[in-house]
Regions:
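Bacterial N-terminal signal peptides that target proteins for export
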Residues: 2-14
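Bacterial N-terminal signal peptides
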Residues: 12-22
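A residue-level marker of the well-folded mature domains of exported/periplasmic proteins
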Residues: 27-267
């Protein structure tokens, strides 16, 4: 591991701030994870898998950083740009606002935002048809349900997650016109992506109302959804990456966005 890599991977914690060691410029690509970290078993981990696949197959190296809070976004992005990383890939829509400001300052750097859109000549925006995949798992949920009630638990209450919810509900109704679809969002702040305890609470609430298949599109919060569904002997549906192995026999299926492929291609 290079000195630059070690320095960057140690940039964690708001009190310490974000600062690079005294190293030379590098041209490796960089990946900045969203809140929740690269081992969230969902969106971020899918991005990490794509980066690792790229490194393994090409023999290349890349820089990475995990954030602890929103305040670190601008510093992390600016430091990578100033030290020559190219391209710089950001996992998650929440990078949009800071990227809109910084991208024009570094016209020779290619930026890639996954799951968001920024209109700039040096920015590649990668988005998915999440409503279509959600439609398919909605059909599967309704077909597997014995109670006639299925559930959806989203992360942050934003239009992106509403598309997951709408696609899921429409798919469920397409398979069973009489199905009841319950829906909850975890919260309105970025913390909603990494709150498995709250995810479990919402899951129990839906189970109490009759849901026997529950789809989680909530990042790390979904880990709590899947665990609680397993404990209650009902089905869950994973998202972003294949989560079936987390609870074999309990996770009905997973809706893959192939964030890993997007990351691999971006590098």
């Amino acid at each position: 591991m290079t000195k630059s890599s070690r320095a960057l991977k140690s940039l964690m914690g708001a009190a310490a701030g974000l600062a690079l060691g005294a190293t030379g410029a590098f041209a490796d690509p960089a990946l900045i994870f969203d809140l929740g970290g690269k081992f969230d078993r969902s969106f971020n981990e899918a991005a990490f898998g794509g980066a690792e696949a790229w490194a393994s197959e090409t023999g290349g190296s890349y820089q990475e950083i995990e954030l602890q809070n929103d305040a670190q976004r601008e510093q992390a992005l600016r430091r990578f740009a100033e030290n020559g990383s190219n391209p710089i890939v950001m996992a998650g829509f929440a990078w949009g606002s800071v990227l809109e400001v910084l991208a024009p300052e570094y016209p020779d750097t290619k930026f890639v935002i996954i799951d968001g859109v920024v209109d700039a000549p040096n920015v590649q925006s990668v988005i998915f048809r999440e409503h279509e995949g959600s439609y398919l798992v909605g059909m599967l949920a309704a077909m597997a349900s014995e109670s006639g009630t299925v559930g959806f638990i989203g992360g942050m209450d934003i239009p992106l997650i509403s598309r997951f919810a709408c696609g899921y509900a429409q798919g469920a109704v397409a398979a069973n016109a009489d199905v009841t679809v319950l829906s909850n969002m975890t919260g309105t702040t970025p913390d909603a992506w990494n709150d498995p305890v709250r995810g479990g609470e919402l899951t129990r609430g839906q189970i109490d109302r009759g849901a026997d298949v529950i789809y989680a599109a909530a990042g790390g919060t979904g880990v709590g959804v899947l665990q609680t569904a397993t404990d209650a002997s009902v089905y869950s549906i994973g998202v972003d990456r294949n989560q079936n192995h987390l609870h074999p026999g309990s996770v009905l299926t997973s809706m893959l966005q192939r964030v890993d492929v997007a990351l691999y291609t971006a590098f």
